[in-house]
Curated annotation (Swiss-Prot):
InterPro entries: CRAL-TRIO_dom (IPR001251), CRAL-TRIO_dom_sf (IPR036865), CRAL/TRIO_N_dom (IPR011074), CRAL/TRIO_N_dom_sf (IPR036273), Sfh5 (IPR042938). One of its GO terms (cellular component) is cytosol. Its main location: cytoplasm. Non-classical phosphatidylinositol (PtdIns) transfer protein (PITP), which exhibits PtdIns-binding/transfer activity in the absence of detectable PtdCho-binding/transfer activity. Regulates PtdIns(4,5)P2 homeostasis at the plasma membrane. Heme-binding protein that may play a role in organic oxidant-induced stress responses. It catalyses: a 1,2-diacyl-sn-glycero-3-phospho-(1D-myo-inositol)(in) = a 1,2-diacyl-sn-glycero-3-phospho-(1D-myo-inositol)(out). Keywords: Cytoplasm, Endoplasmic reticulum, Heme, Iron, Lipid transport, Membrane, Metal-binding, Microsome, Transport. Residues 102-266 form the CRAL-TRIO domain. One of its GO terms (molecular function) is phosphatidylinositol transfer activity. This is Phosphatidylinositol transfer protein SFH5. The gene is SFH5. SUPFAM superfamilies: CRAL/TRIO domain, CRAL/TRIO N-terminal domain. Disulfide bonds: none annotated. Pfam families: CRAL_TRIO, CRAL_TRIO_N. Residues 275-362 are annotated as: Disordered.
Length: 362
């Protein structure tokens, strides 16, 4: 029996783990009474939200959870079950399409093009635009639904028929004008809850994470934290003290303010509702498919199989004294300022890091 292209990179033990999870999936879906992950159905059931079922997309998503739990079936089942329960209750797809409070408008941007105009989904988190932390982070429910909405809108643009980078996004945290000397209760609470959500429910969704315009003081903290994180996690983080150095890692397509030749960031941003746009595009493609002459077909296969997602679960940080230490991401940048911590750090790293940051600040 031949191995599908999207699974050929896997080791025999990993293939076996995936097969076991596939066999357990119907029970998990029945238990949670939910069938959608990142906008895609995990079974052929027609009811409920999500795009049409595809075995390839299902496998790519399952591999993210397996990778995050080192292919331990019991732990993966628990993580997947918890994520499905959370999605049913929290309704992240609604977060993606909802109109959020205008106070969040300037905090996040999504772009979908990279070098040479090639597809590259990137989250830009502009925490320097926060003028009133208590107003933004004090509204914990509103902030979290907005932040989850940004993530879901980004995931809707990814290609879940491709393992590795094709089904992952870049994330840039810009800390320009952010003060790390104060840590109010609202900001700390927002940071901890966002970290928990992204670590628990969005494993292996970040290819790399960049922290730019980071004060030298915080770089010292990042370097210290690196010693306690896995190589896979550290390999995802890149830290730059000067935002204009970002082009060294990503190329000239980034905006001029980040050292590239691209236009203003806000002009590069996609529309507010890419989820609907993606669904419309998929509908049109299906209509074209039905118009094809008999004998032609397209299969949901993968070309060159890439490496499945990295190992650490995805985490998130807010502009507090604990920014970098809470997220996973990519290879350290080729500059002296790029001693970054890991990609999607585990929740337990959040607190120690923030404490280290406070001590350093003092």
């Amino acid at each position: 029996m031949s191995i599908p292209a999207h699974l050929q990179i896997l080791q025999p033990s990993e293939l076996e783990a995936l097969k076991k999870l596939q066999d357990e999936l119907p029970k998990i879906l029945e238990k949670t009474d939910y069938n959608e992950m990142y906008g895609h159905k995990l079974s052929e059931a027609e009811d409920g939200p999500g795009k049409a079922y595809s075995e390839v997309k299902r496998d790519i998503i399952l591999l993210k959870f397996l990778k995050a739990r080192d292919y331990d079936i019991a732990q993966t089942k628990d993580m997947l079950t918890d994520a499905l329960k959370w999605r049913k209750e929290f309704d992240p797809l609604d977060c993606a399409s909802a109109k959020h409070d205008s106070k969040f408008d300037k905090l996040g941007v999504i772009t979908d093009k990279g070098a040479g105009g090639e597809p590259q989904v990137t989250n830009w988190n502009l925490y320097g635009a926060v003028s009133n932390r208590k107003e933004i982070f004090g509204d914990l429910k509103g902030f979290l639904r907005w932040r989850v909405g940004i993530m879901e809108r980004s995931l809707a643009l990814l290609d879940f028929t491709k393992p590795g980078a094709g089904s992952m996004l870049l994330q840039i945290h810009d800390y320009k004008n952010v003060s790390f000397l104060r840590l109010d209760a609202e900001t700390k609470a927002a940071s901890k809850e966002t970290i928990r959500v992204f670590q628990s429910y969005y494993p292996e969704t970040l290819e790399r994470k960049f922290f730019v315009n980071v004060p030298t003081l915080m770089q010292f903290v990042f370097g210290f934290v690196n010693k306690f994180l896995s190589r896979e996690t550290v390999a995802k983080f890149v830290v730059y003290s000067n935002g204009k150095d970002l082009h060294k890692s990503l190329g000239s397509w980034v905006p001029a303010e980040y050292g590239g030749k691209g236009g203003p960031l806000l002009e590069m941003a996609i529309s507010d509702h890419p989820v609907q746009e993606a669904e419309t595009k998929e509908t049109k493609e299906k209509e074209k498919e039905t118009e094809k002459p008999v004998g032609t077909s397209e299969t949901d296969t993968v070309g060159d199989a890439a490496e499945p997602a990295p190992t650490e679960p995805a985490a998130e940080t807010v502009p507090t004294t604990e920014p970098a230490p809470t997220e996973p991401a990519a290879e350290t940048a080729p500059t002296e300022s790029s001693t970054a911590p890991s990609a999607e750090p585990a929740a337990e790293t959040a607190e120690p890091v923030s404490e280290g940051a406070k001590v350093a600040a003092q």
